[in-house]
Amino acid sequence: MVMGLGLFLLVFLLGLGLTPPTLALDNPRYRDFLTKHYDATPQGRNDRYCESKMRKLGLTSPCKAINTFIHGNSRHIKAICRDENGNPYGENLRISKSPFQVTTCNLRGGSPRPPCRYRATAGFRNIVVACENDLPVHLDQSIFRP
């Protein structure tokens, strides 16, 4: 009986440790944020990267004018919504304490109709996000740091 209770307690505690990431992925706005703005290990970070990535995400019908991809560790992005890596910024926004590697894809030409051609701008920037339940749900802007 004691062995069974100990095993149950161990499984319960392990379950608690696994719950937060699972709950985070259950948030549809956070999942949408990651889909549209997160790419851990980009290939290229050039115009071709932008055109391929935007097409894969379905952001080319109509052509989205601008989109920024954040690269690196998603835990650091989530930490912007807490004091760990973020500060209040404006009304209901948070700015990262540290810069992130990003690629911004800007639509070339004026037409929102495909084929979409993008110009890539790669760099390190502090990012501004809107948070919901300590999770980023909207990328407001990115700020170049000198």
Curated annotation (Swiss-Prot):
Regulation of its activity: Has weak tRNA ribonuclease activity by itself due to partial autoinhibition by its C-terminus, which folds into a short alpha-helix that partially occludes the substrate-binding site. In absence of stress, the ribonuclease activity is inhibited by RNH1 in the cytoplasm. In response to stress, dissociates from RNH1 in the cytoplasm and associates with cytoplasmic ribosomes with vacant A-sites: ribosomes directly activate the tRNA ribonuclease activity of ANG by refolding the C-terminal alpha-helix. In response to stress, the angiogenic activity of ANG is inhibited by RNH1 in the nucleus.
Segment forming the signal sequence: 1-24
SUPFAM superfamilies: RNase A-like (SSF54076)
CC annotations in GO: angiogenin-PRI complex; basement membrane; cytoplasm; cytoplasmic stress granule; endocytic vesicle; extracellular space; nucleolus; nucleus
Residue numbers annotated as active site: H37 (proton acceptor), H138 (proton donor)
Motif interval(s): Nucleolar localization signal: 55-59
Enzyme class label: hydrolase
Enzyme Commission no: 3.1.27.-
Binding annotation for tRNA: R45, C105, I127
Residue pairs linked by disulfide bridges in the UniProt entry: C50-C105, C63-C116, C81-C131
Name the record gives this protein: Angiogenin
Gene that encodes it: ANG
